[in-house]
């Protein structure tokens, strides 16, 4: 190599190094400081998320999948979600919605509901692979599915069912069978506690919402027990 060519290459290398030194280091805290930067950062996060979803799909054990979501992936992505919320920007954010799904998958209902309410206000939608595209329906279904399974297993599903009821049978517009399932379960819980009037109230509301909910036998038993309790009370007086 000639001395002239070697000198030219050295000058070019020094120029590249100088240019690189002027580029600021990547700072996650500044990645959401503008809409353009936010979209670039979202693309990076989605690439990482796709890889992590493939990792989950490759695991056969449900317990191991839950551990991965709870112990590794949620801490990894929650920081980004918190920064997105703090930035005040509004755009479709599949990463936020996936974090929401994982919170409910891992039965972190308090954090999940808090994020769900934000997502609803933000206009976020569920991923295309979900038949239920609105967040409200996803949350209501997830909680009642879990609660019914817990009750069947002899464990207490409260206070989650009661806490969500004002939204499920009130603020949120849902297919009527969903709030009817909440009232059906709450009616059964009230019967277990011999709170007959409250049980009848829930069971009647379940039928009002969705006549095919199937609580006729329970409703008759609660009414019979209530009449018996009232008769006993009157005789004591």
What does each of the following model-derived ranges do?
Residues 1-90, 117-173, 228, 232-237:
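N-terminal alpha-helical interaction modules that lie
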Residues 89-90, 134, 175-178, 210, ...:
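Residue signature of alpha-solenoid helical repeat architecture, marking inter-repeat boundaries
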Residues 95-96, 100, 135-143, 183, ...:
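TPR repeat positional signature
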Residues 100-101, 148, 188, 221:
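Residue-level recognition of tetratricopeptide repeat
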Residues 102-103, 183, 190, 223:
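Residue at a conserved register position within TPR or TPR-like alpha-solenoid repeats
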């Amino acid at each position: 190599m000639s001395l002239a060519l070697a000198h030219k290459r050295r000058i070019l290398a020094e120029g590249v190094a100088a240019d690189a030194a002027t580029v600021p280091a990547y700072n996650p805290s500044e990645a959401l400081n503008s809409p353009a930067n936010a979209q670039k950062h979202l693309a990076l996060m989605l690439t990482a998320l796709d890889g992590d979803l493939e990792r989950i799909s490759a695991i056969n054990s449900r317990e191991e999948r839950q551990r991965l979501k709870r112990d590794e992936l949620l801490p990894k992505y929650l920081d980004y979600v918190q920064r997105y919320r703090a930035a005040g920007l509004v755009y479709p954010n599949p990463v936020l919605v996936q974090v929401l799904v994982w919170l409910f998958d891992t039965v972190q209902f308090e954090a999940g509901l808090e994020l769900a309410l934000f997502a609803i206000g933000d206009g976020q939608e569920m991923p295309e692979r979900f038949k239920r595209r609105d967040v409200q329906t996803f949350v209501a279904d997830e909680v009642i599915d879990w609660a019914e399974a817990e009750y069947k297993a002899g464990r207490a599903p409260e206070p989650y069912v009661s806490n969500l009821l004002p939204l499920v049978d009130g603020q949120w517009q849902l297919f009527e069978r969903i709030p009817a399932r909440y009232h059906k379960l709450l009616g059964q819980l009230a019967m277990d506690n011999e709170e007959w009037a409250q049980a009848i109230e829930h069971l009647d509301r379940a039928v009002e919402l969705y006549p095919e909910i199937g609580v006729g036998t329970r409703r008759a038993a609660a009414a019979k027990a209530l009449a018996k309790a009232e008769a006993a009370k009157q005789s004591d007086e």
